[in-house]
Regions:
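Charged, gly/pro-rich active-site loop segments
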Residues: 1, 72-140
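Short, basic/aromatic recognition patches
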Residues: 1-15
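A generic local structural motif
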Residues: 2-5, 29-31, 49-51, 101
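Short secondary-structure boundary/capping segments
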Residues: 7-8, 34, 54, 104-106, ...
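Alpha-helix boundary recognition
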Residues: 10-11, 57-58, 96
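Short beta-strand segments
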Residues: 13-48, 54-56, 62-66, 75-76
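Generic structural signal for secondary-structure transition and capping sites
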Residues: 14-15, 61, 100, 121
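Short, acidic/turn-prone active-site loops that include or flank metal/cofactor-
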Residues: 68-70
């Protein structure tokens, strides 16, 4: 699957499961609303009181699963950053284009935004015979 088709697949899905690692090494997962950049970055919001927030600040490596309808999924591993300044504004614009109803969340106490840059992506479609399983090359 090329990057354009992968982007189109990911954009069709509004939710993903993000997994992070706690301070004691325990994996923790949460369903989050997502937006996807053309560079295949995943943007999501959370609050600083969530478990994922301190996990990602201390250990930015994380993973996502996006999609699952019809056994089509993207497995995604990457590095999370909390953007600020002009970068934050740019990513918020992308996020709110996907989630306009979340724009009022900017006023929530402790709201935070993360951008996860991919380091490894695999697309799988188990509805096909034989299944389609493709890894996508990520350039550094």
């Amino acid at each position: 699957m090329d990057r354009i088709a992968l982007h189109a697949f990911m954009v069709r899905h509004r939710f993903g499961v993000v997994s992070s690692i706690s301070g004691d090494g325990t994996p923790q997962s949460a369903l989050v609303g997502i937006a996807i950049t053309p560079q295949l970055e995943i943007i999501f919001d959370t609050v600083r009181s969530s478990r994922k927030y301190p996990n990602l600040i201390a250990r930015p490596v994380c993973s996502f699963v996006v999609g699952w309808t019809g056994e089509q999924t993207v497995q995604f591993e990457g590095y999370a950053t909390e953007p600020n300044g002009p970068d934050l504004k740019r990513y918020q614009e992308i996020y709110f284009a996907a989630w306009p109803e979340c724009e009022p969340h900017m006023n929530w106490p402790g709201i935070a935004y993360f951008v996860v840059r991919p380091r490894w992506i695999r697309y799988s479609d188990y509805d096909q015979k034989p299944p389609i399983i493709e890894e996508v090359a990520i350039s550094s």
